[in-house]
From Swiss-Prot:
Annotated EC: 2.4.2.9
InterPro entries reported for this sequence: PRibTrfase_dom (IPR000836), PRTase-like (IPR029057), PyrR (IPR023050), PyrR_bifunctional (IPR050137)
GO molecular function, one term: uracil phosphoribosyltransferase activity
Organism: Roseiflexus castenholzii (strain DSM 13941 / HLO8)
Gene Ontology biological-process entries: regulation of DNA-templated transcription
The protein, known as: Bifunctional protein PyrR
Family according to the record: Belongs to the purine/pyrimidine phosphoribosyltransferase family. PyrR subfamily.
Catalytic activity, as annotated: UMP + diphosphate = 5-phospho-alpha-D-ribose 1-diphosphate + uracil
Residue ranges annotated as motif PRPP-binding: 98-110
């Protein structure tokens, strides 16, 4: 299994800054905007976006954490005892523009689970999706509103995102070649 780096820490920072500007532009500011990071790597990306939005607009945007474990459609094949983490959305999402944040968009199934989980907390005015990487291969009709980088991949490749808040070390995004017997 080999890996090839496609984004380094500076590339990730620039992508997140650009996405923050796009969020401001699309929503005519950040009034009534909230960010919700999909656990695990969506959370630090949401916090980074919030910091960038505050720098651009001078307004602190609320950030929530969403665990989708029990909403996944592959729960039965992922193992007998899923580890469920806390969801923490300490603000009312009703009537807000909620930007879901995740690291990689692939089949769309994680986003579908996140939408199901999020709507259990209320009825946002709209939900937008921000991802660091869109790798294609959609199985559901889901499209990101904000994309850091489009990275076409083959089915025998996966994207590995490393963020210092979760993984330690230096930030980076890598394409990793995997064998056909390995599942993502």
């Amino acid at each position: 299994m080999g890996e090839k780096q496609i984004l380094d820490a500076d590339d990730i920072r620039r992508a997140m800054t650009r996405i923050a500007h796009e969020i401001v532009e699309r929503n005519a500011g950040v009034r009534d905007v909230a960010l919700v990071g999909v656990r695990r790597r969506g959370v630090p990306l949401a916090l980074r976006l919030a910091a960038a939005l505050e720098e651009i607009e001078g307004v602190r945007v609320p950030v929530g954490i969403l665990d989708i474990t029990l909403y996944r459609d592959d729960l039965g094949i992922r193992g007998p005892a899923p580890v469920v983490h806390a969801t923490d959305i300490p603000f009312d999402i009703n009537g807000r523009t909620v930007v879901l944040v995740d690291d990689v968009l692939y089949t769309g199934r994680t986003v579908r689970a996140a939408l199901d989980a999020l709507t259990d907390f209320g009825r946002p005015a709209r939900i937008q999706l921000a991802v660091l990487i869109d790798r294609g291969h959609r199985e559901l009709p889901i499209r990101a509103d904000f994309v850091g980088k489009n990275v076409p991949t083959s089915r025998d490749e996966r994207i590995a995102t490393r963020l210092h808040e979760v993984d330690g070390g230096v930030d980076g995004v890598f394409i990793v070649r995997v064998s056909e017997s390995t599942t993502e």
